[in-house]
């Protein structure tokens, strides 16, 4: 008869790229916090805790901010304690601005360039 008696609604997730970009933006703006003490509630004698920025000049985090308690280990240097191998001695791409680029991978230590000439058989036919 042309009339609609049933409606179906559903929620759809954003694209993976959209979620990734959102999380990366939050990660880049994350701030280190400490566990602060707001005082006590006299009625229940329960201590109320909250997160305070490590740097008092920063604003307190909102419920939507990404925060962290501990600094990340230094992945540039070897550490048996954290199990990080460091980046010394690794090959890097001097023309890449990405994670494999020498500027990021060498952690500001500088790097040596090496030019190689490679001759290979290409099995070309003319």
Swiss-Prot record:
Gene3D superfamilies: 3.30.2460.20
Subcellular localization(s) per the UniProt record: Secreted, Extracellular space, Extracellular matrix; Secreted
GO molecular function: cytokine activity; frizzled binding
Listed SMART domains: WNT1
Chief location of this protein within or outside the cell: secreted
Recorded superkingdom: Eukaryota
GO biological process assignments: canonical Wnt signaling pathway; cell fate commitment; neuron differentiation
Post-translational modification summary for this protein: Palmitoleoylation is required for efficient binding to frizzled receptors. Palmitoleoylation is necessary for proper trafficking to cell surface. Depalmitoleoylated by NOTUM, leading to inhibit Wnt signaling pathway.
InterPro entries membership: Wnt (IPR005817), Wnt1 (IPR009139), Wnt_C (IPR043158)
Intrachain S-S bonds: 92-107
Glycosylation sites: 93, 123
Lipidated residue numbers (O-palmitoleoyl serine): 1
This protein's GO CC annotations: extracellular space
Keywords: Developmental protein, Disulfide bond, Extracellular matrix, Glycoprotein, Lipoprotein, Secreted, Wnt signaling pathway
Purpose: Ligand for members of the frizzled family of seven transmembrane receptors. Acts in the canonical Wnt signaling pathway by promoting beta-catenin-dependent transcriptional activation. Plays an essential role in the development of the embryonic brain and central nervous system (CNS). Has a role in osteoblast function, bone development and bone homeostasis.
Family classification: Belongs to the Wnt family.
Protein name: Protein Wnt-1
Source organism of this protein record: Plestiodon skiltonianus (Western skink)
This protein's encoding gene: WNT-1
